[in-house]
Amino acid sequence: MADSSEGPRAGPGEVAELPGDESGTPGGEAFPLSSLANLFEGEDGSLSPSPADASRPAGPGDGRPNLRMKFQGAFRKGVPNPIDLLESTLYESSVVPGPKKAPMDSLFDYGTYRHHSSDNKRWRKKIIEKQPQSPKAPAPQPPPILKVFNRPILFDIVSRGSTADLDGLLPFLLTHKKRLTDEEFREPSTGKTCLPKALLNLSNGRNDTIPVLLDIAERTGNMREFINSPFRDIYYRGQTALHIAIERRCKHYVELLVAQGADVHAQARGRFFQPKDEGGYFYFGELPLSLAACTNQPHIVNYLTENPHKKADMRRQDSRGNTVLHALVAIADNTRENTKFVTKMYDLLLLKCARLFPDSNLEAVLNNDGLSPLMMAAKTGKIGIFQHIIRREVTDEDTRHLSRKFKDWAYGPVYSSLYDLSSLDTCGEEASVLEILVYNSKIENRHEMLAVEPINELLRDKWRKFGAVSFYINVVSYLCAMVIFTLTAYYQPLEGTPPYPYRTTVDYLRLAGEVITLFTGVLFFFTNIKDLFMKKCPGVNSLFIDGSFQLLYFIYSVLVIVSAALYLAGIEAYLAVMVFALVLGWMNALYFTRGLKLTGTYSIMIQKILFKDLFRFLLVYLLFMIGYASALVSLLNPCANMKVCNEDQTNCTVPTYPSCRDSETFSTFLLDLFKLTIGMGDLEMLSSTKYPVVFIILLVTYIILTFVLLLNMLIALMGETVGQVSKESKHIWKLQWATTILDIERSFPVFLRKAFRSGEMVTVGKSSDGTPDRRWCFRVDEVNWSHWNQNLGIINEDPGKNETYQYYGFSHTVGRLRRDRWSSVVPRVVELNKNSNPDEVVVPLDSMGNPRCDGHQQGYPRKWRTDDAPL
């Protein structure tokens, strides 16, 4: 009896059927040609054997019908060689083709590796049917199915969020000793792994494959590398999965990543994350904490700074040296909604840093450009955050040292505030906010920022202390110098060669005038060299519009020095240079018109018309003149090389323009065209033209284009410029006035600057270490009718009292208060409210600290008051 464990045996001359081989291919023998005898019998659909055939043992001819049916189908389908079909069945691929294009951004075809176990099942079925009497042995376990994963497959799975398709990923990685951070699983263009891909494809804020991927990375031993794997392309370089989770506003994934070891100080430095003026799209400060702050996510900010795993350092700076406060200033855009969230986030971070790092002042950190957040707000024109910083008032005693505004005393709606002048007015020791606002012409709204308190009152105080007196002294001095220069030029000797001898009293007076003129020229030269080339932001616009007088003074000084050098060298051409300097010197006297409001805007109109309207007009007009002069001169008859004599042959002349065309006709004709433009020309040359009609047509079109069109366009443009300047005359004059004050202050030596410094040294409270907090502050008397009964954080309870008072156990001296301050406050209040609309309500910025517990939040109505109501 045959052993049941053996397969079917082949008889003599028969070919045994191999297990798992349905085609009946003989093993060890050549393929018989007689097997092709009945090739064309049957159809493709007749491959299924009958139940009787299936139950009988395999015989010697069982493989032939199968071959016959396969070859028959091959001929019907057009296969040229049936043997190729036979070989294709022997080596059939086990990879099932996938879809033509993978989802998302992949362009690769992919498939899944599968094992065909049906052959073994058929072989076992034949054995069981052949020997039914043997006991049924337990079926062997099939080999495990090993899936094949590559980048397109993996990215498709995580994009769909299908955790079931990731079942075979871990065995595949362990079997082939691979990791999810290998290059074959990264996007070639960006270096992106499957974790950022999953975070970018969330459904309702979730993607169930993310925890599975993290678990697989932990089992393969590269969890931190997998989480912190950054983008490597130039566009998104440095971005990690933590950045994406924060940007997607998924706090649960932020917590998961940080708990697993995500780098909370990773820096995204790609081109996409640069400022817009540098070709980027969204600059947020590179760091994850800055991204959470700039996208208004305080809950994530709190977690990053207070989590038990790895806290984000709020003092960390990016590649530009910017902290998270700098980043908030950078994204501010002066809109209401943006300013509201930026200021709240700014206060949150500032207070949190003060509690976590008491010895550090986050607001004092400078970036690579040497700018603090306050200076950066001033330089970029972010008036919302700028006003909030300089007027910040903290009521909490633990963080009161962060205040920049302190209420000294209050009486009804009137209160006196002390503003911290640190960084605002530095007396030349370092760059100040005031200088940035005045000299940086790139700030379009700087006149609005100069109106913010205490900047406005600070400029007034400087003008009262030294600005007005110094300005009028400069006016008188400059006018005297120009009169001396004029007299010196007028009384130049008419005979001889320079340098002229000095013999008489008049000669010695002329010598004194020349020395004074040369001294003023040298003084202006070095002064303007310092002003033009040592300013923080000169720029082209600053030089030719805002700094036009500095440039003109510099040119004037150069002309004076050159004229003096030519005079000493004995060259008579010094006189031509001197007269240009004389004209320019008198024109520069317009600089002093900015000291008066009546004439201040007039000089601004002249500057804008010269550098804007007139420049464009002259450019177009010059092109017209050259074109028409070339055409009209070509129509003139050339001059003959013969003399025209009268009858007596004694007075002979050579014909020249306008009777004909000679070598100097073009330059002379340009002057004639200019005369025609202003209505002073004549047509003497018309008689010497070849085609008078063409000549007249050209002249008429020239007059229409220049005299009628261009001149009227110039007048219209100048009128528009004057109208624009008139609308903003107050702001423009105030800006010029502020520039004049700072120019005068910068001309003083350091000791004079400190002597005329505005403000007073005041002890405003305690520092973070408990020592007295002494600051240089500037006092501003203000009035507020909307929140005037909430001044709970005042320093002095007696309004206008000039004495030493006690505050929390130690003395504080306000110092240098005017005794008549209270008497000066009431007229100031009346002035501020004289022209105001009764319906207008001034809403101040929210103070930092606990909400007020005061129930009386409104003042007296302005249309009535009680008998005991304060004035």
Swiss-Prot record:
The consequence of residue 197 to R is: In MTD; lethal form; decreased protein stability; reduced ATP-binding
Localization terms from the record: Cell membrane; Apical cell membrane; Cell junction, Adherens junction; Cell projection, Cilium
- What does the entry's domain section say? The ANK repeat region mediates interaction with Ca(2+)-calmodulin and ATP binding. The ANK repeat region mediates interaction with phosphatidylinositol-4,5-bisphosphate and related phosphatidylinositides.
Query: By what name is this protein known?
Result: Transient receptor potential cation channel subfamily V member 4
* Phosphotyrosine PTM sites in chain numbering: 110, 253, 805
- Look up what happens after changing residue 89 to I: In MTD; lethal form
Q: Cite the effect that the entry attributes to residue 251 to E.
A: No effect on channel activity. No effect on interaction with membranes enriched in phosphatidylinositol-2,4-bisphosphate
Residue positions where Phosphoserine is found in the record = 824
As recorded in Swiss-Prot or TrEMBL, the protein's gene is named: TRPV4
